[in-house]
């Protein structure tokens, strides 16, 4: 076990944000979460601590590794001002130290009585006033917060497995921090970053790069009192859901801001690896991507919100692959024909009679044609039967019902003869599809609560010989719920989509739409593919996109 100390007369009056481990308890996985800065008062705060077997010490001459009797086992000469350290899940201890002369950040490992530099990165363009590390419990990839003056800050991925180019660590996000930061601390178990602002107090914000909130938790708290405040309040534990890694991502959508929304997967009938992903850009149109995430086609059909498709539909003795999208400007449903090689053409535009067209899904009806379920923000859900007269596609209204508040995501489970639809603030509903294709009464399957957090967004059914699972996006907690697609609709588990450091893919947050297929698309997608919209493109910072997740990974983390 290794703990950290520091000795210096250079910077008095502030107890660095990271003495949870040093001043309160011996260093352990349970006490991780504290940024460190050179101060004399920090060294004095070491007195109540139990003697560990090894300790890291930042002295004037450099970083030292001490044994239990305080004898120097190893020393790495340097002048340093900011540092922090963590014990990794494999038992190793690493420290991130900023060289006071060059500004370079050095990742140092304490190993077998030695100190060894593992990685180094150029410092940021601004002057660093506070530095602290973060090791997320659910996906322990080492990250660093570097905070400067005037409210400037950045969050970096400094894990050994992360790619780095031209001497720079991958930046996960820019931070709007406090204007006069005097130190920072991260309580890993809470996924919470604390920043001390001189003359104001202590601010707290999410350490998760995908979240944004910040609030003042201790007005007037002096920076020197931060360790005592943290000790008095105790340490909570965030909801640590299992994490799956994305294996791919699409290029960013063309529209800026909140533009990407809903995907749909088209499976190539002969070459599954040549399958396509349709994705709505709700500002400009519909994009088509291959499984490598490259855009193969773009249809400038305006503000289409959601999209769905079905393959092998029967009309006039022929088979058709068709996609439908909700068009908000014209309050219509746009119908697309899909060719055998995955090319889309606009085939028709159907009126709905709705005032604010929003979500859409579709399913094969008993005659082998397509039924479309399109909803309005006022709660109305309309069922339209797609018909073909000669070479013309038309829509025939079949039924309509209404939820109390705004719906959006929905999915038709043809095998189960049922429609699932999400009411954003209330929960997940199920309606039986009758033999004549009409809808039965609505049944609340899973209300909004601790498991399914609002807003309820995208949903899709993965059906294979192993069973049928409904996966639903719970936008408020950046999570996904998996439940059985048949009564009693038992919840199997929840998960989040984290980052993939090796491939340079950021994590997923605030998901709108999703789709899933059980088809074998080859490679890691042998058991199917889950595609989810990512509400915040962090790494690198850019426009929204869609992430690809092997379904086998989802099942791997289910209980």
Segments and roles (model prediction):
Residues 2-16:
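Bacterial N-terminal signal peptides that target proteins for export
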Residues 29-559:
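Sequence/structural signature of beta-propeller domains
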Residues 16-26:
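Bacterial N-terminal signal peptides
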